[in-house]
Amino acid sequence: MYFRIRKLDEPDSNDNDFYVVIPVKDIFTWFCSIYSLDKTSIFIHDINNLNPNEYTIQQVIPGSDISPIKNLNEYLTNDIIITNTLDLNDLETFIYLLTNGANNSEGIKLLVTWCVYYGRLDVLNYLVDNNILPTENTLRDYLPITISENHDEVYKFIIDHEFHLGYKSNNLSWILTSEYKYINSLKYTLSNDLKLSDLIFMHHLKVEILQELFSSGYEFDNRLFEKICRTTNITLIKFFMDIGFDPMNIVIQPNQLCIYLANILLDSGRQFTQNEISQIITFSIVSDDYWDIIAFTERTGYNWNNINDNFINCIIRRGSLDHLKDILNRTSLNINRFIDNIVITAIFDSRKDLIMYAYENNVDIAKYIQSLPYSNDTNFIKWYIELLNSDGNFKSDNNIINFINHGTGTHKFEILKYLLENDCYEDPNYIIEHICCPFNIGKNNTDIHEPIVVELLNLCESKQIDVPKLTPIIISNYLLSNRKISNTLLKFGTTIYSDGIIDNDSDINNILLNIINNQCEEIKDYVYNKPQLWTNKSIMLATIISENIDLFDFLLELNRDNNLYLEQSFILCANSIKMLKHFVNSINLDITSRVRETYVYAYSIIKNKSVASYLLLYYGNDMIYDSDNIFENQKNLFVNDFLREIKNLNFV
């Protein structure tokens, strides 16, 4: 029994004539996990008949009913007959699936999580009543989070059936103490022997939750109060003291003592050593007011020469410049001891005040240029460079420009623009190299980078700076499946590259650009008169990607007696299912020896699942998967050597 899972926004059929279907045993794994716990956007179609011999892909299909993809619990078929569409809101759907084989351990575990998340008590009750449960401990590490309106009922059910469902009540405590809306569930949990003092983390506790529990008669213990006192949450500490808890009855180490409690202990007669005071103020600097800490040190007679570096570094990271100056004035410490941390922190946090403090103390801030990549503030980086360029003689070195390679933020291209506009460079070629960085960025980011790249190129043109590699890079990206970026740059017009077919026989850039731009009127005559171009694989690949069947047939005809060229063309058809089908229908050639390589190219290298699926259905699983390690020998593939040439801008 197989099912097809379809999202609401997916069409009822597809253009590729094949469908992914799921065996019943894996149905919960798929819709609970792979479809991201989304119960509102999925159809589950009950497939009654899988008979690919009735409907074929291009009139050819292997004899097996279905072709499995190794290591994935999905199957491909080109024929489905939908007998029923199942409703996930109906309990009968789950009963139907469970009684027909959807009961493997992983699927049940995910189903329980899904039911908790959506509050499906009807399904949970059915699972418990019929002893269809996860294996022991499978959910021990899962937090049972629910988004349902009936969360109180869901959590009560989990508590009552925690052993059956594979949860532990302790896992609930963190959730139930995070928001007041869970107060009823928390009370029910506490009435079933869960203790708040078993909580590992206390910082998130809400005082209104504790107030409600106290009003309802819940008894807190000293163990819980001790854990609360180890936090810096003064509101919680005050609450416990107001209801009668005494900090003198517990033992708290100085390195876990906030200033508020430390002052209370002082009032009660406790004395602290210089080392203990250092520990207290270092712990408190994260959350306590700086001047409260200073008042505590004055009260205890603290000698600031005993301070440790951790305290100073915390002031640098978390405090104000005034606090840093005050501390350094109180100690005999030299600023140079902390200057690296000051400047690097300033760059990370875009702190101009710290940079100016270092600058005014004669620190050479130029040596920290290599840290600029870690700032995401364009204005700060510009300001930093302006500070370096205060005499108008600053020229960027490779360290500044190199940060363009450390990320994909638009602000990094803005800095290149600033360097170009202000002539802050010695060699423009090094900057120009980095203008091409968008080509190495995932194609999904193209829309983000297009405007700034256009500005950079226009700026280069206005300054008469040549960008010699741009044309081959455009072509390379088009041939390497980064086509959206290439098409973006093709919009820039004839200022970037020459028009028409070029006269130099050795240069095929314009041939490829014309194919990419679908301006192929002259290409056939030109190529026909240049036999040295007949077997050029880059021309064939551009033709396949552009799906120009007329030019494709022309190139195949030129090479009809060249079996190696034809086989390699078949492999390159992995880029287009349309061209692959056309090749199969047009060329009478045994290319079975190349099917596996074509599949690896489609599935693993360019991620063209449509072509990979077509090959599985067309040629059969056995032909492709004669080995369990077909992806391990990719280095020996023809296509890898060819793609490497393209990356090197060599269009062979």
From Swiss-Prot:
Where do the ANK repeat units fall? 77-105, 106-136, 138-167, 192-219, 220-242, 243-274, 307-337, 396-430, 468-498, 535-564
Top-rank taxon, per record: Viruses
Keywords of this protein's UniProt record, alphabetized?
A: ANK repeat, Repeat
Q: Tell whether Transport is among the UniProt keywords.
A: no
Annotated protein name in UniProt: Putative ankyrin repeat protein R734
